[in-house]
């Protein structure tokens, strides 16, 4: 009987994830941001979108790499609009707040331009997401990003978004944030 218990314990131990690997961090969501002026921006040159903005975020963070995709499009009536798409290169999660950054892949004319996106998962009380922040060469707001961006993301938080936050349209979706486990 003791050999059976030992084998069972060994199988259970091997089935558990390695403590050195930790759990993956996650940020997922889709929705529509309300138009208007963002709340709590850090930068002084904030734009107030006149139209709703659709977004989609899928990001995963492992101990040694971050992957994912961000997409967004302005919902201008009667216009198809371009989808801005980028590969996620960094992710920083603190509690229910996340920031992701990377390089645009679409539209082609902006391929390689760094971007940043902030979000706060407030559960049923209403999530917040920032408008897409683009940082071409010479952009004055580049000083608000850490050295090494887009491989290293800035800190997230309600008062940390460079361009502030827009509320999600009720019933349009949401954001889910899970910090990585050590």
Regions found by a protein language model. Give the residues of each.
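C-terminal region of N-terminal signal peptides and the immediate post-cleavage residues
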Residues: 15-30
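C-terminal partner/receptor-binding element of secreted or periplasmic proteins
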Residues: 130-182
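Short polar catalytic/cofactor-binding loops
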Residues: 31-39
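Bacterial N-terminal signal peptides
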Residues: 6-17
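Short polybasic amphipathic segments
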Residues: 68-72, 125-137
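Extracellular secreted precursors and ectodomains with disulfide-bonded cysteine-rich loops/domains
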Residues: 35, 46, 88, 150-152
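Predominantly extracellular/secreted and cell-surface proteins with exposed
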Residues: 40-123
């Amino acid at each position: 009987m003791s050999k059976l218990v030992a084998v069972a314990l060994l199988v259970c131990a091997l089935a558990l994830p390695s403590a050195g690997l930790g759990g993956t961090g996650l940020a997922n969501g889709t929705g529509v941001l309300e138009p208007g002026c963002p709340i709590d921006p850090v930068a002084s040159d904030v734009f107030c979108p006149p139209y709703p903005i659709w977004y989609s975020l899928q990001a995963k963070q492992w101990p040694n790499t971050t992957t994912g995709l961000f997409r967004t499009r302005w919902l201008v009536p009667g216009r198809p609009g371009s989808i801005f798409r980028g590969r996620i290169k960094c992710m920083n999660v603190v509690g229910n707040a996340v920031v992701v950054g990377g390089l645009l892949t679409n539209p082609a004319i902006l391929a390689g331009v760094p971007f940043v996106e902030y979000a706060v998962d407030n559960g049923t009380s209403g999530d917040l997401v920032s408008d897409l922040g683009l940082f071409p060469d010479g952009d004055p707001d580049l000083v608000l990003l850490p050295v090494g961006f887009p491989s290293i993301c800035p800190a997230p938080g309600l008062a940390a978004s460079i361009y502030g936050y827009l509320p999600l349209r009720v019933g349009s979706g949401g954001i889910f944030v899970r910090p990585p486990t050590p």
